[in-house]
A protein has these predicted regions:
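ATP-dependent small-molecule kinase phosphotransfer cores
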Residues: 33-91, 97-98
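Walker A/P-loop
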Residues: 13
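ATP-binding Walker
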Residues: 10
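The feature captures the helix immediately C-terminal to the Walker
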Residues: 16-17
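Extreme N-terminal starter segment of soluble prokaryotic enzymes
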Residues: 1-3
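P-loop (Walker A) phosphate-binding loop of NTP-binding proteins
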Residues: 5-7
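Post-Walker A helix-loop "phosphate-sensing" segment adjacent to the P-loop in P-loop NTPases
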Residues: 21-30
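Conserved phosphate-donor/acceptor-positioning beta-strand/loop module used by diverse small-molecule
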Residues: 91-96, 106-128
Length: 128
């Protein structure tokens, strides 16, 4: 499993999608979130959009490999989704540093971690 991690706006989602296009055997782990979808996002493709109550229920049931609350919204990766995908595929994650740290605690997961940064702070500010 490959993890691409970076601060917001650096381009990890764009890079993840390009890798998947070029190497279709890489499946993208689709995270769950409580934030509202953006106009161009598709439920089940970009994120699995759920309510805060649903997310908190999944937390209490210990269903996540990793989760975090960022700017009043939850983001997380369900264990079942990862376990199902990893059986027959290479898997790529597009998550933040908090998620990477939590996933690293699971010794049964073989991880390749890549952290992306940018030296162009002006462009990063424009993206955010």
């Amino acid at each position: 499993m490959v993890i691409l991690s970076s601060p917001s706006g650096v381009g990890k989602t764009t890079i993840t999608k390009k890798i998947h296009q070029k190497y279709p055997t890489f499946k993208i782990s689709v995270s769950h979130t409580t934030r509202l979808p953006r106009s161009n996002e598709v439920n089940g493709v970009d994120y699995n959009f759920i309510t805060s109550n649903e997310f908190e229920k999944l937390i209490n049931e210990k269903k996540f490999y990793e989760y975090a609350k960022i700017f009043d919204n939850y983001y997380g990766t369900l264990k079942k989704n990862v376990d199902d995908l990893i059986l027959n595929n290479d898997l790529i994650f597009d998550i933040d540093w908090q998620g990477t740290k939590q996933l690293s605690k699971f010794k049964n997961l073989k991880l390749i971690k890549i952290y992306l940064i940018t030296s162009n702070k002006k462009e990063l500010k424009e993206r955010l």
